Structure formats: structure tokens, C-alpha cells
Amino acid sequence: MEPQKGIFIAESAKVIERAVRAGYEPVSFLLGERWLDQMMPLFERLAVREGAGPVPVFVASMELMEQLTGFNVTRGALAAFRRPRQIPVAEFLGGVVEAAGERPVRVCVLEGIVDHTNVGAIFRSAAALNVDGILVSPTCCDPLYRRSARVSMGTVFQVPWTRIGSEARVWPHDGLAALRDAGFSCAAMALTDDSVSLDDPALQEIDRLAIFMGTEGAGLGAKTIAGCDRAVRIPMAHGVDSLNVAAASAVAFWQLCPHVSNEYHYQPGLYH
């Protein structure tokens, strides 16, 4: 669990810029000397924000940055941001349903995923493939952790997310109840005797669908699978029975989420 109050660290110019664009409040910046010019346009925008105070910018050699942080800062830029308020699940689900309008709603529930790289990769796929929101269980790692945010390429600041479930000892019952109260059908990505194929047309007809993804190795818990309305499997060849959770999420999102235009829109300042 991440602290309810405090800060998180973003690493790399791209990730920092996406955090700022998403409305996260910076506390301070630490840059390698050669990254200062690249970051100046962002600092100039921050300087003219209405009602915002000054944000300190510290510039140091890469050697000093490594001494200060305790790791190799390969991306050359770090920023501390204030952690936002955690949105209650009912409010969160109401928001994503309202934002979706008339189209089907798709959310993903991450159960107990402890690898920050996988969490970041799942968020990146969710942003690309039109997932409406992500909910993380009490034992899932922090999406705002530095490595998660970096692997996601900053999409953790784009995809709406919140915690679901009050504590591990009552999971998944409280999480499943919250989703059903909001009108969601729950699908466990799991290989069971009665699982349906991901390409089953009936899945596309579900108006509000929560896709449950399990932890690395063990997958979803037995209580979670039993509590969901159905289990769903990805059809695979050559005797392979599972994929890495990040890869599996991308396949599931592509199949189950409404497809969007394939036009690519360049956004200055976000892509380098």
C-alpha cells in the first residue's frame, strides 16, 4: 500500500511532463545539468500558473544525483509530486460510467500484482486500448511508484484508477460487491474447466464489464474466480497455457474494449 498522504517520484522528462499535464502538483525537481534546457519550456509554463507558488529546481551532476538518490538516474530528471486524494470506489465507478456515455464500459481489476514493471505495462496497454479505468486490490503495488510510472510512459497519470477493497482479509468479497452495486459483470481471466474463450461474442454484449487480472505466477485467487460471474481464457497454441500478466492484459483489452480510431496524433512535448 502507498501512503495516503505524501509524495511520489516521477522519473524522466516525458513522465514528468505527463504528470504536470494531468494536473498533478509538483513539489520540486532534481535534474542532471544537460537536461535543464530540455525542461525549461515546462518550467516556464509552471511559472505562469495562476495561484501557484514557486517550485524549486535543483541541478546537479549525474554523479551527485546518484549519490543523493542511491540509484543510477539514467533518464536525468526526477520530480516530487503531491499524491492526490484516493477516490472512493463508488464515486470512481460512477465517474467512469458517466464519462463513457452510451458506449460499453470496461474496467480492469488488478489483484495482488507486486511487480512494478507489470503494473506500468498494464497501464500503458490500458491507455492505448481504451480501458475506462483500473482498480487495484489491497495487496497490489503502487501504480505511482517511480518504476511503474516510468514503464507506463506516464500513462498512470492518464488512465483513471483507484484502490478497491478495504483490506486484504476481506478481499475479494467487498470488491466484488462494490462492482456489482455499480452494475458491473465480473470476468476472471483464468484457466478453469468452465472458462469461456476470450473471443466469445457474448462478452462483447456486456454493457459494464470488470476484467480481473491476477498476480504473477499464481494468478487469481480461488475465491476471486469463484466470486466472478465467469472465467475467461485466452485461446493459445503449442500447448502454452498462460502469458505474462502484462501481455495477457493487452490481449484481453484489445478483444474486449471498444476500438478507437487508428489515426496517430502527434502531441508536441509528449513524444521525443
Predicted regions, residues:
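Active-site/ligand-binding-proximal alpha/beta "capping" segment
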Residues: A187-V240
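N-terminal positively charged helical leader segments and presequences
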Residues: M1-N72, P268-H272
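Structured adenosyl-cofactor binding patch, chiefly the S-adenosyl-L-methionine
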Residues: A79, S125-L129, P143-F157, A222-H272
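RNA substrate-binding interface of SAM-dependent RNA methyltransferases
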Residues: R21, G51-A52, A90-D194
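Short, hinge-like loop/turn segments at secondary-structure boundaries
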Residues: R45-V48, G76-A77, V151-T155, Q204-D207
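Short, acidic/turn-prone active-site loops that include or flank metal/cofactor-
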Residues: R34-L36, M62-L64, T139-C141, I164-E167, ...
